[in-house]
């Protein structure tokens, strides 16, 4: 009896750790990003909480793994800055694309073809895509904070360090980076709260116009703490409009990014924790991927970008989490925040920008696995990474990366590195660029 009690206590504490130290910040950051696409902040808070709770609980009950599902950083940036603001899709159409990406992900998982797809994509390009998305969201964070501004001559330049927004951002970024460097638990959420506290007097001194949170109540004039959940985004997805030919690349990128992000995360967590089956694969991988895919479908229906498994789940694993009870605990802890959208709305956009910049920096880690001494790999990797922020499009970076990889491998006499699946992807990429 004592052993069982200790086991349950350990699992619950691991779930609490995963929530507070690693994933809580997404409740603040995701609504801030998606509200830029014209979506109501309070409604995105509701959708974010429901997806995180639903996905994590499903992962715990169905897949029996201690992995947390939350809204993917990078996927939410692609949703807002590429699909809606870049390509001009309505957010309803973009939500439809999220839904169909989840359906595609689900089919690939059921038919067991996901392994063949993954094997067809060169490892170097997988790493480049992750790093490129990191550069992209970091660039967005720097723009939102006013550190990078438009320039008619050089396209971009450094913003004014005398600007209160930029100054507050730099102080908050520095404090958060120091906390992370010193391995302070919950450093990200502490940094966001510190920045919010600092922005309060600055917002008072310089007025509301200086600290703006994209159309929601500012630090100076907020409306309260509690409110009933806002379900106005439920079933708003344009399911049929999102499968027009012109929008199919958006569906592909959502599915592609979610698939590889999930697989790499599952593999990484399995390696770190030792949770593997007899074949050396991540424990209950198929069920975990199905839970991830169903959560993505659910995301599109309730009104937010794709949910995905979080590598930060390692926090709970380090605390002793071994079973689905850890994920279930974290999922339950999200639910009370359904009623806190007014309180969450007082967090300024510069605090969310700190999370974008730092999470983007974390996504550079896979670049250490690339053989930079081989030009036929290094050049496509560079193109993939650099074109995402410079063209403001994750899709463009992926497409140019695939095309340049195939071209250089072919003319380098390494045709064995070009497989049929890669050729099909290249053909589709050319059609997209041509049409």
State the predicted function of each range:
Residues 51-73:
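Juxtamembrane transmembrane-helix boundary signature
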Residues 2-11, 36, 40-44, 69, ...:
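Membrane-helix interfacial "entry" motifs
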Residues 3-31, 51-52, 72-81, 85-133, ...:
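Helix-loop-helix junctions within the multi-pass membrane cores of secondary transporters/permeases
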Residues 1-43, 156-158, 192-286, 429-431:
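Helix-loop-helix hairpins and the membrane-proximal interhelical loops
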């Amino acid at each position: 009896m004592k052993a069982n009690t200790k086991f349950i206590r350990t699992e619950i504490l691991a779930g609490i750790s995963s929530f507070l130290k690693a994933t809580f910040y997404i409740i603040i950051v995701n609504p801030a990003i998606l509200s830029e696409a014209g979506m109501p902040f309070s409604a995105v808070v509701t959708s974010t909480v429901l997806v995180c709770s639903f996905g994590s609980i499903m992962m715990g009950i169905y897949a029996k793994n201690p992995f947390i599902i939350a809204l993917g950083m990078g996927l939410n940036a692609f949703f807002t800055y590429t699909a809606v603001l870049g390509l001009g899709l309505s957010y309803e159409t973009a939500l439809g694309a999220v839904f169909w990406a989840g359906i595609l992900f689900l089919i690939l998982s059921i038919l067991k073809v996901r392994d063949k797809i993954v094997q067809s994509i060169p490892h170097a390009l997988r790493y480049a895509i992750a790093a490129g998305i990191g550069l992209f969201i970091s660039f967005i964070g720097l723009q939102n904070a006013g550190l990078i501004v438009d320039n008619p001559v050089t396209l971009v330049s450094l913003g004014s360090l005398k600007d209160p927004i930029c100054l507050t951002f730099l102080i908050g970024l520095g404090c958060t980076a120091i906390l992370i460097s010193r391995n302070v638990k919950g450093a990200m959420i502490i940094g966001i709260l510190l920045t919010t506290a600092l922005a309060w007097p600055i917002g008072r001194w310089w007025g509301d116009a200086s600290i703006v949170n994209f159309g929601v109540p500012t630090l100076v004039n907020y409306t309260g703490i509690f409110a009933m959940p806002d379900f106005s985004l439920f079933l708003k997805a344009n399911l049929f409009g999102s499968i027009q030919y012109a929008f199919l690349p958006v569906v592909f990128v959502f599915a592609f990014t979610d698939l590889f992000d999930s697989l790499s995360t599952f593999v990484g967590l399995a390696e770190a924790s030792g949770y593997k089956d007899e074949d050396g694969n991540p424990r209950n991988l198929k069920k975990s991927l199905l839970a991830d895919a169903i959560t993505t479908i659910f995301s599109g229906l309730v009104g937010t970008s794709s949910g995905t498994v979080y590598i930060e789940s390692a926090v709970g694993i380090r605390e002793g989490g071994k079973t689905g009870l850890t994920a279930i605990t974290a999922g339950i802890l999200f639910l009370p925040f359904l009623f806190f959208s007014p309180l969450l709305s007082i967090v300024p956009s510069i605090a969310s920008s700190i999370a974008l910049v730092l999470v983007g920096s974390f996504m550079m880690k896979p670049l250490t696995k690339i053989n930079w001494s081989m030009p036929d790999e290094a050049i496509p990797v560079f193109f993939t990474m650099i074109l995402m922020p410079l063209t403001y499009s994750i899709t463009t970076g992926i497409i140019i990366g695939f095309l340049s990889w195939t071209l250089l491998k072919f003319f380098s006499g390494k045709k064995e590195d070009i497989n049929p699946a890669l050729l099909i992807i290249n053909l589709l990429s050319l059609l997209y660029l041509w049409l």
